Amino acid sequence: MSLSTEKKAAIVAEFGRDAKDTGSSEVQIALLTAQINHLQAHFAEHKKDHHGRRGLLRMVSRRRKLLDYLKRTDLALYQSTIARLGLRR
């Protein structure tokens, strides 16, 4: 269950440095957050989907590693990113 192309483009436009910036940490974190939120809604209905849950845990782990990297390299950008995404960290 991936995101639609339009939704990805909107996230890249909001968090990226330009329209084609898909590799920066904040864009990757925002895309992973959108996918994680989508999958959480899926698991509320499909509680026994253990294969999908493993993929969700991989995404959460990847997002955590990217957030740790961003915090180490650019603290101000890290704080603004988690505030814009509404993450608890």
From Swiss-Prot:
Organism: Haemophilus influenzae (strain 86-028NP)
Domain of life per record: Bacteria
Subunit relationships: Part of the 30S ribosomal subunit. Forms a bridge to the 50S subunit in the 70S ribosome, contacting the 23S rRNA.
Family under the similarity heading: Belongs to the universal ribosomal protein uS15 family.
UniProt cross-references to PANTHER family, sorted A to Z: RIBOSOMAL PROTEIN S15, BACTERIAL AND ORGANELLAR, SMALL RIBOSOMAL SUBUNIT PROTEIN US15M
Protein name per Swiss-Prot or TrEMBL: Small ribosomal subunit protein uS15
Molecular function terms from GO: rRNA binding; structural constituent of ribosome
Gene: rpsO
Keyword Cell membrane: no
Record's GO cellular component terms: cytosolic small ribosomal subunit
Family matches, as SMART domains: Ribosomal_S15
